[in-house]
């Protein structure tokens, strides 16, 4: 079992005066920019809940202390008709040869279903100060047979000369109706490999799926290797509208075994105000793990 000591909320939209960040802040991606700055790339949503990607800089030794933030998006929505014209959402970061790659999910509104989501990729050449899209017209992960509406939230690792990707995509059922009467997507966790960072096969392998009929979403989260195994903390969505964090392990990275009692979150201390402590009472989602010096943090949305 992995024990985590909760430290409370770092920020929300009310902490800033940004016209494009007035609602949800989600999918935090921490990045060690320097010894003095831990940059958290995050999706910042406007009144219509359309996401754009910005950042909040915090103290690496005390992430609750905010040092600065982006006054404009570092990654904006695409032009009308593009795969990301109705929102861009952070997915993961990958560094190689002095370049910082940002993988993201692009949203497009639809008529008969609420949306489609496909993955894009962008790159920063200046240590995360600016980001340029590499996929403007065609997504990195476009639709394929069996995964026609959702191929998003990719995470990449390079091992033994091979790129490995875990991502979220349609399961066999595509869409369902939740307890709230709204259409909800069925999706689980996929895996594939490639010899090239910007080119991926049009087939995948299901790495982790549902445990019961009440679940409809297995969202990619944070993955690391330790003790000869892959460890995964993911987001689990259920038809009653809730989201929580789950845990799974794998020997080969292709087939994960869920360990639903593998996470323990200890409550925040008395030094944290109720406002900062209670932000996650309804749900916990979108985890990202990072070790800074001798401390290991789990950033997430509540």
Residue map of PLM features:
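Charged, gly/pro-rich active-site loop segments
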Residues: 91
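Beta-rich carbohydrate-recognition and catalytic domains
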Residues: 1-27, 31-86, 94-153, 157-216, ...
């Amino acid at each position: 079992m992995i024990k985590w000591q909760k430290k409370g909320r770092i920020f929300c939209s009310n902490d800033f005066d940004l016209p494009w960040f007035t609602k949800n802040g989600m999918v935090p991606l921490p990045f060690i920019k320097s010894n003095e700055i831990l940059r958290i790339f995050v999706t910042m949503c406007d009144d219509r809940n359309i996401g754009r990607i910005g950042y909040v800089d915090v103290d690496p030794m005390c992430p609750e202390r905010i040092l600065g933030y982006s006054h404009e998006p570092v990654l904006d929505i695409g032009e009308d008709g593009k795969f990301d014209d109705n929102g861009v959402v952070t997915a993961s970061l990958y560094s190689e040869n002095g370049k910082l790659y940002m993988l993201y999910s692009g949203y497009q509104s639809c008529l008969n279903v609420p949306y489609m989501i496909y993955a894009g990729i962008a790159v920063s050449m200046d240590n995360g100060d600016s980001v340029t899209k590499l996929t403007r017209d065609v997504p990195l992960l476009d639709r394929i047979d069996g995964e026609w509406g959702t191929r998003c939230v990719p995470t990449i690792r390079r091992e033994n000369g091979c790129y490995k990707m875990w991502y979220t995509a349609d399961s066999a059922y595509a869409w369902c109706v939740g307890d709230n009467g709204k259409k909800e997507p069925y999706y689980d966790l996929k895996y594939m490999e490639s010899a090239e960072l910007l080119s991926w096969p049009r087939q995948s392998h299901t790495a982790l799926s549902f445990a019961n009929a009440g679940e409809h979403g297995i969202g990619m989260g944070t993955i690391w290797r330790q003790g000869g195994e892959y460890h995964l903390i993911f987001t689990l969505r259920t038809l009653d509208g809730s989201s929580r964090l789950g845990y799974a392990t794998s020997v080969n990275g292709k087939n994960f075994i869920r360990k639903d009692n593998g996470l323990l979150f200890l409550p925040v201390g008395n030094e944290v105000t109720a406002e900062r402590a209670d932000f996650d009472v309804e749900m916990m989602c979108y985890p990202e793990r990072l070790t800074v010096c001798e401390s290991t943090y789990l950033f997430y949305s509540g």
